Amino acid sequence: MGYLIAFIILLILFVLLITIVPVVMVVYLKKKQLKLTFVPKSQTSFKKIVQKTKDLEEECEDLNNKNNELKKAISDQNLQIDLLKKNNENFLLNATSLTAEQAKKELFNLLKIKFKKELAQEYAKIKHEFNEAQEIYAQNILVETMEQIAEPLIVERSLFNIDIIDENLKGKIIGRDGRNKAVFENEGGVDLIVDRQQPIVGISTPNPIRREIARIVMQKLIDSKNIDINRIELLFKEEREKFEKKVFEIGKNVVEQTLGFFDLPEGIYSYIGRMKFRNSYGQNILSHSLEVAEYAERIAKLINIDPIKAKKAAFFHDIGKTIDFESDLDHVEAGLLIAKKFNLDDYIYNAIESHHNKVIPTTIYGALVKIVDTLSAARPGARVNSYDEYYSRVKELETICMRFEGVKSAYVIKSGRQLRVIVDSNLVSDEQLELLGHEIKVAIEENDLLTNYKIKIVLIKEKRISIDTNIIG
């Protein structure tokens, strides 16, 4: 009986085993299979997961790189600390055998390594303070120099007046039908202004050399009271010859007495003398050059460079203006030509060329001349732009006329409103005279500098015949 019960129990257990266990196994395997084969339902979701995975991998790589950099930085710092410790140890070990100077040097090197950044910052600060101090010092030098040389300003004009006490002389100056006046204007290249209401005679021209010669001639005519055509022509001829001697003496006096130079060739004296009769922007060139030379000399002494060289370079910087209006060169090119003609020093060449930025200053004197030239020209009222513009137009008009064959001379008078052209009667016939006037008119109208100005052109052709008779004693 007991065996039967046991058998029944075993049978029940066997049935349960063969029915339940397979079911459990199937369920388990299905669940396992679902986990292993799970994929997103859509392709877009799958791509997002892949991209997210890549992003996470990149972030992980960046973190690893930063971690490596930090490790390297820490390693470098540790090496520097070890080096400092070692240097300290070596310094302490060697301190007993070092002299005071050696110990000082070792300590300085040690501190320099340790405080390298702080030293760089301190250097930058000191440099900034030094530059500010330099700028203030330079300003003080310029202000002090200008205060010491502040001179009364004289601006040259194109009109010179001569007093006439005897009113009867005015009639003689004008002459019958205005002949004396016309000859004076033609010979002198000036505009003669005779006002019946005023006790003066005015001589007007932007060319200071012509004005000076005409002034001397007029003064001699007034003093002698002997005024006729022949005497006017003779005096102009004489004064032109004397003028070259006069400018030589002026130049010599300026060089030796005013400037104190005794090592210049005498040939350059005439050019220096002509500076007295040349203006630029209404400013007299000789006065300007002397002023600039004095500026340069004073500043040179303050900054410890050769004051004589500075003075020479500054004085000659505008020497070209004595001939630029007689040639096609600008005043820098003309100045360099004069300087080389008389073998002046190289630093003077550089000062002439660089003061208007033709070249870069290659000497301290060239740089100094640029500064002092600006100082002199920048003084309030020192220059008058309209004057120089007027002079440029006059020069251009006269230059155009002189290019034509048969023209003896050309002068601008009547304050720039009239161009008087004197022709050679042997070269220009009466028929050619009108054609010449037309050609001059066209040339003026084609010039951009002169297009906005109305100018009257007067051509003068005069033929004189002089016959001497036998003197009967």
Swiss-Prot record:
The chain crosses the membrane at residues 4-24. It is a single-pass membrane protein. Its EC number is 3.1.-.-. This is Ribonuclease Y. Keywords: Cell membrane, Endonuclease, Hydrolase, Membrane, Nuclease, RNA-binding, Transmembrane, Transmembrane helix. SMART domains: HDc. GO terms for molecular function: RNA binding; RNA endonuclease activity. Pfam families: HD. NCBIfam families: HDIG, PRK12705.1-4. Residues 158-218 form the KH domain. Endoribonuclease that initiates mRNA decay. Residues 285-378 form the HD domain. It is found in: Cell membrane. One of its GO terms (biological process) is mRNA catabolic process. InterPro entries: Diverse_Catalytic_Enzymes, HD/PDEase_dom, HD_domain, HDIG_dom, KH_dom_type_1_sf, Ribonuclease_Y. Belongs to the RNase Y family. GO terms for cellular component: plasma membrane.
